[in-house]
A protein has these predicted regions:
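S-adenosyl-L-methionine
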Residues: 1-30
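Local beta-strand N-terminus motif with an aromatic residue
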Residues: 32-34, 111
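Mobile active-site "lid"/loop adjacent to the S-adenosyl-L-methionine
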Residues: 34-75, 92-99
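Helix-to-beta-strand junctions that scaffold the AdoMet/dcAdoMet cofactor pocket
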Residues: 81-83
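Conserved beta-strand signature within the Rossmann-like core of class I S-adenosyl-L-methionine
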Residues: 86-90
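Conserved Class I S-adenosyl-L-methionine
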Residues: 100-123
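Core SAM-dependent methyltransferase catalytic element
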Residues: 141-170, 174
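Polybasic, low-complexity RNA-engagement segments
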Residues: 163-369
Length: 369
């Protein structure tokens, strides 16, 4: 959950957070990623100076304990990595078994993987092939950080490249172009499968030219992607009227799951069966028949994306008052949702009453104490 929150605060729109094993990820998304970063669990020898209690952990679970875990993670990461892609493997240990030895055995199993040259910061050291039996000279391209030579603790990292054509069509790119998966069936979104309505194609996928779009209405009169309508309900359509033409999303991008409006980062077909923590951008929620934009949406926008907005300076006391959840006053006479920005950067929402009073809508869990 902490990772999902950090991505929300960063305004990330195209990220998916799962709680899955590397093996299941590789089974679901083979050769899907162009970049893979492994922060491998390790014996932690490089952390002894900062946290002496790590010595007890090392005595209980030394390098021999972590080697099979790291081997399995590397194997699944290889399966996840697309041809022409790059992978970083890193640890916080000095152990050659977990560092150069791990990479040497991985390269022996996968001759299509090679070590890349990287630019070293001052004080960074090269890998130590002489520390293992049969170590290849290419292991010197690895990076070691020793606390007596560089600012920091003890670390190891290596950049690996997978041979192949990065532009080679894979199943996912074909699905993006045609809207049809490898099984010949049309790719649907989560809401299609749950019956709550959805987009016809992936939000960020390329739209194939000349393909007829299906009717935007269901037989029962519901709009796709927006679910049931109720008379007098404030729907997202009214909110979209305040979006400028520069906004990176439209009403058609929305799908709905129960009372939550989403912009999915991936088709649910692609991640079906995975334990999901976060599947994309939470656009907003239906609160007692009224649409409320999310805090994540505000942070994912630029100030020019929304017409009704105010821009405070960092020195303005109202910026702090807003972060504390207080009502603020301004010369903004708009009614409805107002985007609150500080020095040009969106921070969250208020709701105007048309007389300059802005009711605070900053997420309660994020407010300053």
């Amino acid at each position: 959950m902490a990772l999902a929150k950090n991505l929300q605060v960063a305004g990330t729109t195209n990220a998916v957070v799962t709680a899955e094993t590397p093996e299941k990820l590789a089974n679901t998304l083979p050769e899907f990623f162009d970049k893979v970063l492994i922060d491998a669990p390790c014996s932690g020898e490089g952390m002894f100076r900062r946290d002496p209690s790590m010595v007890k952990s090392w005595l209980a679970h030394g390098p021999e304990y972590y080697v099979p875990i790291q081997t399995q993670i590397l194997e699944q990461a290889y399966r996840l990595l697309a041809a022409g892609g790059d992978m970083v493997y890193s640890t916080c240990t000095f152990s050659p078994l977990e560092d150069e030895g791990m990479i040497q055995s991985f390269l022996d199993r996968h001759p299509d993987m090679t070590i890349c040259d990287v630019e070293r910061c001052p004080g960074y050291s090269e890998g130590m092939p002489e520390w293992i039996d049969g170590g290849d000279e290419s292991l010197r391209k690895c990076v070691r950080i020793f606390p007596h030579r560089a600012r920091g603790e003890g670390h190891f990292a290596v950049l690996l490249h997978k041979a192949g054509d990065p532009d080679e069509k894979r199943m996912t790119s074909l699905a993006e172009e045609t809207g049809v998966g490898a099984d010949g069936k049309r790719i649907t979104s989560f809401a299609d499968e749950t019956g709550n309505g959805a987009r016809e194609e992936n939000t960020f996928a390329k739209k194939s030219k000349g393909r007829k779009k299906k009717s935007s209405r269901r037989d029962d009169g519901r709009d796709r992607g927006l679910g049931d309508r109720r008379k007098g309900q404030e729907e997202p359509e009214s909110f979209f009227k305040s979006l400028s033409s520069s906004a990176p999303f439209t009403e058609k991008d929305l799908s709905r799951k129960k009372d939550t409006y989403l912009i999915e980062a991936l088709h649910q077909n692609e991640i079906k069966g995975l334990r999901m923590v976060s599947g994309g951008l939470i656009f907003g929620t239906d609160k007692n028949g009224r649409f409320e934009p999310s805090a994540q949406l505000a942070l994912a926008m630029r100030q020019e994306d929304y017409v009704q907005r105010i821009n405070l300076t960092a020195s303005d006391e109202r910026a702090v008052r807003y972060l504390k959840g207080e009502t603020i006053l301004s010369d903004c006479m708009d009614k409805g949702y107002v985007l609150v920005c500080v020095d040009g950067f969106p921070l969250g929402w208020c709701k105007g009453n048309g007389s300059g009073t802005l009711k605070n809508k900053y997420y309660p869990g994020w407010r300053m104490q």
